[in-house]
Amino acid sequence: MKLTFIGATHEVTGSCYFLEAAGKRFLVDCGMEQGPDQYENQDVPVPMSDVDFALLTHAHIDHSGNFPLAYARGFRGPIYATAATCDLCDIMLRDSAHIQTFEAEWRNRKARRNGQPEFVPAYTMEDALNVIQQFVPCDYHKIIQLADGIKVRFVDAGHLLGSSSIEIWITEDGVEKKIIFSGDIGNTDQPLIKDPEYLESADYVVMESTYGDRSHGERPDYVQELVDILRRTFKRHGNVVVPSFAVGRTQEMLYFLRKIKADNMLPEFPDFDVYVDSPLAVQATNIFKEHYVDCYDEEAMELLNQGINPIAFPGLKLSITSDESRAINFDEHYKVILSASGMCDAGRIKHHLKHNLWRENSTIVFVGYQAVGTLGRALLEGAKDVRLFGEEIHVSAEIVRLSGISGHADNEGLMRWASAFKEKPQRVFVTHGEDTVCTLFAERLKNELGYDTYAPFSGTVFDLVNNVLEKETEGIIIEHAKEKAKARKASGVYARLVAAGHRLLAVIRHNEGGANKDLARFADQINSLCDKWDR
């Protein structure tokens, strides 16, 4: 009964885990890395043809995007996921294959001109279409017997339509262990979808830590923030360009924009158009309509019961063909453009950035996570010039981020999820976070909840029966990332300091109601320590 960590270890993208148990070999997630890699990922330690089946937490490409590659390498087993996840993967894996093929063709035109070897995409459309046939839809909350000694259950993670945490019960040689994969834990009070569910028992937990080092803060009024952005941009006769994940975030933005129009919150600009320039987003929106019973929250259901489509409104224009996409940039009227990809590394958004980044009157609004090394992250961090389609583009547009809007729980949301267990798990593995964040959040779980935590690197193997590391690995830094290694090491030490600060706050809370004399002495000791280091 072994667990091997493959991807999203000390990194955010590329989730993949390999389990050997009860005579079966299976994967949990098989994600594609997005943005430059920091560490090398080890391969699955057996031929893909020997993998019996897979489980998938949700449809985002950083969790599902390498299933076509697994197929190309021989994987033929079933992939179990919620019904909504299966439907979303149907369109998202096709889209991923299309983007890869398109990018390969573009790169190869340049390669041929320069006499360089051709670039081969990781997988083809045929691989994607074939692996889609292997998906098996599962209901939320239903325990499913996948094999002798292996049962699973999907519960709502509140991150994306169909997203799940997965409970796995494994029995081997009379020993039963329960392991939970958190998947991506959702933020609370998101539009359309339900909040994440909490789980109460597990022997082992594999937990994400995307925002394990930060708080979203007090929830802003996103609708009013959007109104303010639209008003000042439209007054400049500029466009509002929103790089948005086609699945999930685009539908949330449509939900907000519908409210702005329905409540006449921009009376001076009542006729503004909203373009959704993404065939994938259009398809995803239709899937959102199909799975509302299982996934929608009460507020969205109330609108539907009143006959109101929560993500449709006058002035909404869906762009599917390339000609329709190109025509958007010839429309001189102020407008909102929602386009993918959300991190600006692929898709039609790159064309809209090329046409709007140089314009002082336009605004680029980021509404989602931007991984290290992506174009979106560079723009958020103040890049003055960027390169698009071989052309240097000066950044003159206003760059804005809707603070706190996220499909991911922040550090407090993660702590709430982790603290729901009635008994301490034997071990909590912290993954799916940037390098220092994994370390920081593992320390916080240890200090505040008393959990035995570990932040593994790719290739680490854990014996689930005996609760011991069978193989411990160190992160292998990819060559281009070595220059950042010293900075990461320094920030890792700082992460320990921050974790110690969190522990101190927890100790202070634990002493509430203590004797005044003891509390006064404790306060004096803290102040003395602060005086020493406040320099």
Model-derived regions: residue spans:
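Hard-cation-handling environments
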Residues: 229-374, 386-387, 422, 437, ...
